[in-house]
Amino acid sequence: MILKGENFKMVNKKSNMYQCWINHKGIKKSFYKEYLNNILVLNKSEIITSAVNELKNTFYQIEDVKAIQNIYEDEREIKGDKFIKLYIRENDKLINEGYEIKYLKTEDNKECISICAKNDNGVLYGVFALLRLLEQNYEFKDKEIIDNPKKNIRIVNHWDNIDGTVERGFAGSSILFESCRNKDIMKAVMDAIGGIAATNEALRKAFNDDYKVADDLERINDYARMLSSVGINGVIINNTNVHRSETYLMDDKIDIVKIISEIMGRWGVKTYLSINFAAPITLGDLQTADPLDNEVRTWWKKRAEHVYSIVPNLGGFMVKADSEGRPGPFTYGRNHADGANMLANAIAPYGGILIWRCFVYNCRQDWRDHTIDRAKAAYECFEPLDGHFLDNVYLQIKNGPMDFQVREPIAPLFGTMDKTNKLMELQITQEYTGQQKHVCFLVPWWKEVLSAQTYANATASQVSERINGIAAIVNVGSDENWTGHFLAQANLYGYGRLSWNSDLTSEQIIEEWINLTFGDDPIIIKNVQAILMNSWETYEKYTSPLGIGWMVAPGHHYGPDVDGYEFSPWGTYHRADCNGIGIGRTLESGTGYAGQYNEPLKSLYNNLETCPDELLLFFHHVSYNHVLKSGKTVIQHIYDTHFEGCEAVKEFISKWEELEGKVDKDIYVQTLERLRIQFDSARDWRDQINTYFYRMSGIEDEKGRKIY
């Protein structure tokens, strides 16, 4: 059988789909575009060269083919009366990778827009910021812009496998790796099965293939440029579930890492490697991976020396241990600090950091046992270890206690562990939010999480204040538009901007993205903004209600299956019966999970009367006739929201159809197709959820609508 899909089309790298938000076409309308004629560059580096090339390519894209851009190293040689100046120097107003953009006049009355930074990364970010502002026709005269990143670590995680498949990938195959002989077959596998859990070793053995860096190195360079344009400074290139084949990325496949690292480095993006905790065994050198065993510790030190001798700019390692079948320190009776510190010690001499995921829980739970609670696992595992981790260890904590459900409370770990470095983990790829078949703009959700109060202490209570950086599983693949659904590009753009400055509003971010992507047509801005800003709430309305989560088809996680996980070992239950629904997580009669929060959150969630409606079923098992703060019963809320959500998708389609002829034809057609797929799926969700709970409760819809 021959499988065909979007991956097999030739990618047009000049298309609007491919160019994303960095096509720079809007600069043609800027009053300041003539400054691009002359560029003064006072420092040299590979990253500065990328910054200059960005200005150069922009100039030749927007100007007449006969125009010439001049690059200078000496200000005295500048012939024009307007220029852009790039330079590095100490500046008390700047920190880390921040930049200053300033309008000034020289002694000989020339006009200049200067970009100053403390390092070359800052200059590059300043150039992208300048171009972004030019596209929005910003008035620079007598202005000074100081922009420092809120966090030093701003990374994306790839769940790419070395054979070219992508776990939870919904935009085609990997842009980083591919099979040597069966590339098209592996792309077909991605088309056929999408982002189901990682490719298993049996499939790889059946193909008997070898693996390499993707042939299209130009696309990897374009991707690095895309990341840099929104301030992302790190990329973990391979799946956190490291299998046997990927283990060799730190052995005889290390040249793959070197090639990717060199390309990423041109754009100020550090490369990180997910590693196999059991690598000493997998690579056949030792019989144990015990982190306190001297031979194991020596093995890792030598391995780190080898890796950094070939990839000197590697940012560090990422580890998923003791979770979902992955090996870890628990195997040897050790704790996670033992495991993390052993690896952190090995890479410390090279400036490497060790990112250790906190996604640790018992995935072999007995559904009959109501005392076991997956939500409690990360806190119970890591909180007692506060202060035990080395300074170059960073714990990567999911935004919520479960697994990127459309509504969860913040993870309790953000309100504790003051002596430990913490990263927040978000998910850009839409595993549980429509898999890039549905439009679901995630920035408003992330804003809620980052601004949430933990009540940990008076000086740093907000989640954004209590983390050292942000990470996110990225949504990129080999599709021409990068993200499967064109509008899903807004999530990658939004993540980058939010990781740089979490004070930006969702409205600011989406207005920027629309302007950079589509231009300044007011109808486009109005309609696309209306679709995106309402999409997360809409998705929540027609899927799982009131924070209960899940109810998705097992395995691939797309579409409704109310009882799909109800009797599974994964700890993902809704506990619905003929009387009510919800998980009891109170201190008095539930699992006690609510007790992991600081006051007043502990009491807020623990008390049925004060628990927010949107999280009610996450914390409490209630009857279908329980009255919400809205005045509706739980069952009527379920009926109403599912009808409302489905109707909202109809409105999305109508608003998009108004843009025919105004947006790029290919973008219009592909997006309309996805919106229609979304409506069909939303209707399935509506009818299956409403029918399930009508049959379970026997309570009719007050409005008499059709329920099956």
Predicted regions and their residues:
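Feature activates predominantly on carbohydrate-active enzymes
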Residues: G5-F8, N16-G26, S30-F31, L36, ...
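Structural motif
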Residues: L40-E46, L86-N91, C116-K118, D160, ...
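N-terminal segment of the mature soluble domain
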Residues: T49-E73
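Generic recognition of stable, solvent-exposed alpha-helical segments in well-folded globular domains
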Residues: S50, E54, G122, E218, ...
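Short, well-ordered secondary-structure micro-motifs within conserved domains or adaptor modules
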Residues: K66-E97, I113-S114
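Acidic carboxylate-rich catalytic motifs and surrounding loops in phosphoryl-/glycosyl-chemistry enzymes
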Residues: Q69-D74, W356-N362, K526
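Catalytic-core regions of glycoside hydrolase
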Residues: D210, D285-E511, T517
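Catalytic domains of carbohydrate-active enzymes that cleave complex glycans
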Residues: A458-Y708
